[in-house]
Amino acid sequence: MTVKYVESSKLPTPMGMFAMHGFSDDSSDKEHVVLTMGDVSSEEPVLVRIHSECLTGDALFSLRCDCGAQLQAAMHKIAIEGRGAIFYLRQEGRGIGLLNKIRAYKLQDCGADTVEANERLGFGADMRDYSILKPMFEHLGIAQVKLMTNNPRKIDALTQYGINIVNRIPHETGRNPHNADYLETKKGKLGHMFGEKDGE
C-alpha cells in the first residue's frame, strides 16, 4: 500500500478544536486528510464519517448535492460527542475528478441523472477506491466504528478491511429542491439507504 502518514496539526473550527492528519498516496499522487477529536485510539467504538472531496458542495455551497451539509453535520455530531474522526478523501466527483464532474453536471442539465452522466462519459457510477482507508485506520489505531453513512459500499469496504462496524448511523441532511432527484437516483441506482430514522 502506498498511503503514508505525513504530519498532524491542530485545526480550530467553529465546531471546536480538531486535529488534522495528513496522508500521501504515491500511487495516485493525491493527498488525504483525517480530522479527529478526542482519543480515537482507545478500544471504544469511534464515531466516523468517510467523506469524499466535493469542492462544489463543501466550499462553494452548491445545492446540487448534499455533500457540504453532510460534512458540517458530521463535524457537529463529533463535536457534541467529543470524540470521532472524519476521513476526507480526495476523490472528487465519486472518483472522476473535478473537470469530469463539471462535464457530468452539463449532461445532468440536459436531463441525464447522476449515474447516466458518469456512464455517458465512460466512467462507472462510482469510481472511488476505499482501499486507501486501511493504512489510515491502522495509523490512527481505530478498529471499531459507529459509521455515519447511507452508502452500503462504505459499509462493505470497511468490513472488507477488517474494521468492525458496531453501528450504522443514518446521515441524512441537506435535501432541497435542487438535489431531490439526485438523492432519489442515489437511492434507486446506488442503493443508498434514505428515509430511515436517525439512530444516534
UniProtKB/Swiss-Prot annotation:
The active site is at D126 (proton acceptor), R128 (nucleophile). The keyword Cytoplasm does not apply. Pathway: Cofactor biosynthesis; riboflavin biosynthesis; 5-amino-6-(D-ribitylamino)uracil from GTP: step 1/4. It catalyses: GTP + 4 H2O = 2,5-diamino-6-hydroxy-4-(5-phosphoribosylamino)-pyrimidine + formate + 2 phosphate + 3 H(+). Zn(2+) binds at C54, C65, C67. GO terms for biological process: riboflavin biosynthetic process. One of its GO terms (molecular function) is GTP binding. GTP binds at R49, I50, H51, S52, E53, Q70, E92, G93, R94, T114, T149, K154. Its EC number is 3.5.4.25. Pfam families: GTP_cyclohydro2 (PF00925). Its cofactor is Zn(2+). Belongs to the GTP cyclohydrolase II family. Catalyzes the conversion of GTP to 2,5-diamino-6-ribosylamino-4(3H)-pyrimidinone 5'-phosphate (DARP), formate and pyrophosphate. This is GTP cyclohydrolase-2. It comes from Saccharophagus degradans (strain 2-40 / ATCC 43961 / DSM 17024).
